[in-house]
Amino acid sequence: MYTDSHCHLSFPELVAQLPDIRQKMQAAHVTRALCICTTIEEFDQVHHLAKTYDNFWSTVGVHPDNEDIYEPTVQDLVEKGQLPRVIAIGETGLDYYQMSERKGGRSIDDMEWQRDRFRNHIRAARQIQLPMVIHTRASSDDTLRILKEEGEAGDVGSAGGVFHCFTETQAVAKAALDLGFYISFSGILTFKTAQELRDVAAWMPLDRMLIETDSPYLAPVPYRGKTNNPSYVPFVAKILAELKGMTPEQIGELTSTNFDRLFPKLQAS
């Protein structure tokens, strides 16, 4: 049994293929998937998937590199986060790389709106005690700092969350673990150039790991460059299994157990 802890099944590349994807998931023993919300406008579609299929769940949140869209208030996030089948807040966080690239080298000082948005997501998560799905790219220092400033190590620590599609150093991983977070590995782990990330994964405690596809992006080897989907998450488990001296099936069961522990609202949804 495998669980894809992060996918975007509402995106156009995947939603039209959903019946085929579900068949492929079944054949690959991928029994569950968490469908990630990236804008408030997208939420209804993501939530519809979770309400329609009993092995899908949803989040609510706004991705940090979506600038010119409706900005949710804490109350917006709280109201949607309390709906059935919504088990996390996110994805949220900071992405200085994407915004700098798109905006012609904009400085970090120009991205205060990202930090304000992140704080609102943290406050919503704290209010309703939902875990968060964290996106951080070229911004780990600020991500960790804001989590600490917002009391993540205190009253939100019990809810925690996950640093998804992890690509950072072991030091960042340890800091995230110390705050009560889990770490999720994607198809990047299979890339030839990702030896440093595999070293982090080899070090990672077994009880704090998740696996994901981040589909339709980041298809693992041997499908790199193609459209990703949740049925490919066992390829991530295979690499983790090699690093840990386990079988892929054991990694699948272990990470599914971790998923259940991190997202307790699963049991009530």
Residue ranges of model-derived segments:
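Mid-domain alpha/beta scaffold segments of enzyme catalytic cores
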Residues: M1-S269
